Regions:
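Hydrophobic positions on the long internal alpha-helix
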Residues: 1, 45-46, 110, 114
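Conserved Rossmann-fold NAD(P)-dependent oxidoreductase catalytic core, especially the SDR/UDP-sugar
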Residues: 1-34
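A short helix-coil junction within the Rossmann-fold of NAD(P)-dependent oxidoreductases
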Residues: 1-5, 49, 118
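Hydrophobic/aromatic residues located in beta-strands of well-ordered beta-sheets
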Residues: 6-10, 57, 90, 151
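Active-site proximal helix/loop that lines the substrate pocket
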Residues: 12-18, 64-70, 131
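Active-site helix of classical SDR
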Residues: 34, 38-41
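NAD(P)-dependent short-chain dehydrogenase/reductase
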Residues: 44-98, 104-106, 141
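C-terminal substrate-binding subdomain of Rossmann-fold SDR/epimerase-dehydratase oxidoreductases
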Residues: 85-87, 91-95, 99-186
Length: 186
């Protein structure tokens, strides 16, 4: 369709594969999970088609979204469901790995801001820009939601294929958000 000027797709940090450190738009992707492989293939095909059709391409790379819906598959959804059931303990790893967490409302603001502007495109990390220990974020989540549940540390082993510390470079999303605040001030 010639009326479509921009193609924006929700990506995932899982398309990167095992990596430790800060991820930016130039970080090589070597996914090892079927989900990561599928997301990476979608990103590559969409980028090629957008270029062929002369469309602006935005790949919105999501990281770890924190929300209290009990219907998702994230650790936060599982804890919410367990708390709703009245469970007093939640089996957990040691929680030492560090990830980039973003609260759902902030995630939504970032995605909305990214797709409604035309200055920054390509791969845009929808992220906080900093790593945080899983145990710290989960404990804070439990407290924020006033859940009466405790983590049972060490019930599960840490997964050997999980990165010890992985987070997004937030340069592009910061630039977008600065542009949004400039427009609002005018």
């Amino acid at each position: 369709n010639t009326e479509i000027k921009t193609v924006a797709v929700m990506g995932s940090m899982h398309e990167i594969g095992f990596f430790e450190g800060s991820i930016d738009e130039n970080t090589s992707c070597r996914p090892e999970s079927f989900y990561g492989i599928a997301k990476n293939a979608l990103r590559e095909v969409t980028a090629i088609l957008a270029k062929q059709e002369k469309k602006t391409f935005m790949w919105l790379r999501g990281f770890y979204i924190v929300g209290n819906s009990q219907y998702g598959s994230s650790i936060f959804s599982k804890i919410s469901a367990a708390a709703e059931r009245g469970d007093k303990e939640f089996p957990f790893t040691m929680g030492l790995n560090q990830f980039d967490f973003l609260d759902y409302d902030v995630f939504c603001k970032y995605v909305s801001a990214a797709i409604t502007q035309d200055k920054v495109n390509g791969i845009i990390n929808i992220c906080s820009g900093r790593p945080e220990r899983l145990s710290d974020r989960v404990e804070r989540f439990i407290k924020e939601n006033d859940y009466n549940i405790k983590l049972k540390y060490g019930a599960f082993p840490d997964r050997p294929y999980d990165s010890k510390a992985i987070w997004g470079n937030d340069t592009k999303i910061k630039s977008i958000m600065e542009g949004v605040s400039t427009i609002i001030k005018k």
